[in-house]
Swiss-Prot record:
CDD domains: trimeric_dUTPase. It catalyses: dUTP + H2O = dUMP + diphosphate + H(+). The keyword Hydrolase applies. Pathway: Pyrimidine metabolism; dUMP biosynthesis; dUMP from dCTP (dUTP route): step 2/2. This is Deoxyuridine 5'-triphosphate nucleotidohydrolase. This enzyme is involved in nucleotide metabolism: it produces dUMP, the immediate precursor of thymidine nucleotides and it decreases the intracellular concentration of dUTP so that uracil cannot be incorporated into DNA. GO terms for biological process: dUMP biosynthetic process; dUTP catabolic process. The keyword Hydrolase applies. Keywords: Hydrolase, Magnesium, Metal-binding, Nucleotide metabolism. The lineage of its organism: Bacteria, Pseudomonadati, Pseudomonadota, Gammaproteobacteria, Enterobacterales.
Amino acid sequence: MMKKIDVKILDPRVGQQFPLPTYATSGSAGLDLRACLDDAVELAPGATTLLPTGLAIHIADPSLAAVILPRSGLGHKHGVVLGNLVGLIDSDYQGQLMVSVWNRGQQSFIIEPGERIAQMVFVPVVQAEFNLVEEFDATDRGEGGFGHSGRK
């Protein structure tokens, strides 16, 4: 079942010059977000910048959130990833979707107007309430943390 999410177009080029986010295939999890820029932006090695998408969403359902994730090709081929690694969009947020990009590569990268820069995935949310305890029931793992199970 397709969930309906309210979206506002903040830049008139979205839906005209720049396509609205859509799923590329019936099995796609993410919707591509585009850089809603007037001019190309040069992202120097090590630099970060905040890019507008021209869209605002209001999820409204507290059992849902959206995450903004990098596009694998930009990171692998060009070293361009999200500046905050993952963006979290809460259900009650109503502002413009902005994407923080970071060039961790060795070469400058040019971001063109309308270029696909990130992807957005809707995820279920469970809000939890903490139950204060003095001790936990014992488990096989216990406090075993990073690397406790080995590499093979």
